[in-house]
From Swiss-Prot:
Gene: dmsD
InterPro entries in alphabetical order: DmsD-type (IPR026269), DmsD_chaperone (IPR028611), DMSO/NO3_reduct_chaperone (IPR020945), TorD-like_sf (IPR036411), TorD/DmsD_chaperones (IPR050289)
Pfam families according to UniProt: Nitrate_red_del
Record-stated family: Belongs to the TorD/DmsD family. DmsD subfamily.
Species annotation: Salmonella typhi
A molecular function (GO) term: signal sequence binding
Protein's recorded name: Tat proofreading chaperone DmsD
Keyword Iron: no
Record-level GO BP terms: chaperone-mediated protein folding
Protein role: Required for biogenesis/assembly of DMSO reductase, but not for the interaction of the DmsA signal peptide with the Tat system. May be part of a chaperone cascade complex that facilitates a folding-maturation pathway for the substrate protein.
Record's keyword terms, sorted: Chaperone
């Protein structure tokens, strides 16, 4: 049986979403993706219903006084408190800290499965964008069982809450649309998962 993880569009969409959440919009990884989302052609390539994508596509193209790099800095870097921190342990740890127990559990799982994933900087591995990039890499390398585990155990327990808060506080139409696109896409993935999503308490 072919699972959704074995389709090319899973790896592509995971890599696109992961890059847009992880890298600056001016970076060589994401600048072409940003330009693609500002046009209409991408909708035909995205594995979601066109009717659901139409309002998202319109929002991507909505003008904002704040530049995209400024919005990315505010949402992902600081210097002020991030409105929706993109690290899993901030949501899963009672103290809402980086490098929390959930991060350590992810590291242990990666070690047990022989997975090495280089982070851009000295930051936790449970960054939302990084986990999507890792999911894409696992799917591209035929490691579908590990990809399902990553999604069900280490991403989906907290990502819906993260995305809800991210969308509400994005403050920029491009990133609000990106959050909505991610929420729609991940909900479709979750509906097709074979293994159940781990139930974990959230503290934000």
């Amino acid at each position: 049986m072919t699972t959704f993880l074995q389709r090319d569009d899973f790896a592509v969409t995971a890599r696109v979403l992961g890059a847009l959440f992880y890298y600056s919009p001016e970076s060589h990884e994401t600048a072409p993706l940003v330009q693609a989302l500002l046009n209409d052609d991408w909708q035909a390539q995205w594995p979601l219903d066109a009717e659901a994508l139409a309002p998202v596509a319109a929002m991507f193209k909505t003008h904002s006084e704040e530049s995209l790099p400024q919005a990315w800095q505010r949402l992902f870097i600081g210097p002020y408190a991030l409105p929706s921190p993109p690290w899993g342990s901030v949501w899963l740890d009672r103290e809402s800290v980086l490098f929390g127990d959930s991060t350590l559990a992810l590291r242990q799982w990666m070690r047990e499965n022989g997975i090495q994933f280089e982070m851009q900087q000295n930051e936790p591995e449970d960054h939302f964008g990084a986990l999507l990039l890792l999911a894409a890499w696992l799917a591209e390398n035929g490691r579908h069982h590990e990809c399902e585990q990553l999604l069900a155990w280490h991403l989906f327990p907290w990502s819906p809450r993260f995305l809800d808060v991210f969308i509400d506080h994005a403050g920029h139409p491009f990133y609000q649309a990106l959050g909505q696109l991610a929420r729609l896409t991940l909900a479709q993935w979750q509906a097709q998962l074979i293994i159940p999503v781990a139930v974990k308490p959230l503290f934000r």
